[in-house]
Amino acid sequence: GYEEREIAETVRELEEA
């Protein structure tokens, strides 16, 4: 869903940090 995609993107950014 929409939330799932949002978390996935956020997690990706957090892992990159």
From Swiss-Prot:
Stretches that traverse the bilayer: none
Keyword entries, A-Z: Gamma-carboxyglutamic acid, Ion channel impairing toxin, Ionotropic glutamate receptor inhibitor, Neurotoxin, Postsynaptic neurotoxin, Secreted, Toxin
Determine the domain of life of the protein's source: Eukaryota
Instruction: Name where it's found.
Output: Secreted
- Kindly indicate whether the keyword Glycoprotein belongs to this entry: no
- Native organism is Conus caracteristicus
User: Where are the 4-carboxyglutamate residues found in this chain?
Assistant: E3, E4, E6, E9, E13
Tissue expression notes: Expressed by the venom duct.
- This chain belongs to the protein called Conantokin-Ca2
**Additional remarks:** The mature peptide does not contain cysteine residue.
Kinase is among the record's keywords: no
Reported function: Conantokins inhibit N-methyl-D-aspartate (NMDA) receptors.
Q: Which GO terms describe its molecular function?
A: ion channel regulator activity; toxin activity
List, alphabetically, the GO terms of the cellular component aspect: extracellular region; host cell postsynaptic membrane
